């Protein structure tokens, strides 16, 4: 079993940027002290939904403060920056951390990112797939090459060389299209915390079928699952503190992107729009209903309840790499206390999939 801590770097109402950044750093250090395997970061721009716009810089800070903790991105918004620049950042972190950096990517969901950085949002899937292949191939060969599909430049040698033979990578996968693309290449995917156990199981079945058809060993691919987590002997307190955080967090999320508005005609995001329509039909756009939905899917409550929920998804998916977000627990002291309760009262009792 492996356990990660994901930090959203969200700015709750009433908190300053300095408070959010100080907490981000301390949670990274605490992750090593509590024996988490990985500390994960997320990229966001121009919104209080997340203050870490440059994950290479953020990860370098945490890597420099720790000795054994892996630090990763979940993920880099790949289409919005030049692949050569990203590859140099990636390789430098890989070398300076002696292989402790994990390169996780996403295609991006926030329209302002694409407008400001000068990228067509409707091309995000094609660019993400293209750039990811270029970077991963280049990390092995030492040469960055493009076929001119989305960007064109002459072949260049990239430095430094990779510290590891194979740089750890992953990609958040929500749609069938992304799942299929990753499966064809045998690449690890990250499963969302907002889908049900049956949906996770179906996603893994699709992935495994396609990956096996393409000759990949499905038992040797390091997928991960994400959860929102609050561990407390008082289940009502755990649910209450998550509600207080998530009600503001959800509002910030929907305000950060216009993809869910009826007037939005951006192509290429049919899965996300369909998921939102399902939420509307089920009443989950109502804040209370959506918080109930989230708490039912995620390990929020007593240690026993948290074990039951996570183990259920482990057995359904075969995934034993678990990533948890603890920021919904309130103050920094309460967040770290919940992290500690998880590592002492939940993690030791989780078992590899049946």
Curated annotation (Swiss-Prot):
One term of GO molecular function: alkanal monooxygenase (FMN-linked) activity
EC number(s) given by UniProt: 1.14.14.3
Superkingdom of the source species: Bacteria
Recorded catalytic activity of this chain's protein: a long-chain fatty aldehyde + FMNH2 + O2 = a long-chain fatty acid + hnu + FMN + H2O + 2 H(+)
Pfam families: Bac_luciferase
Keywords: Flavoprotein, FMN, Luminescence, Monooxygenase, Oxidoreductase, Photoprotein
InterPro entries noted in UniProt: Alkanal_monooxygenase, Bact_Lucif_Oxidored, Bacterial_luciferase_CS, Luciferase-like_dom, Luciferase-like_sf, Luciferase_bac/NFP
Entry GO terms, CC: cytosol
SUPFAM superfamilies linked: Bacterial luciferase-like
GO biological-process terms attached to the record: bioluminescence
Cysteine-cysteine disulfides: none
Enzyme class: oxidoreductase
Annotated function: Light-emitting reaction in luminous bacteria.
Subunit structure, interactors included: Heterodimer of an alpha and a beta chain.
Family stated for the protein in its record: Belongs to the bacterial luciferase oxidoreductase family.
Name this protein carries in UniProt: Alkanal monooxygenase alpha chain
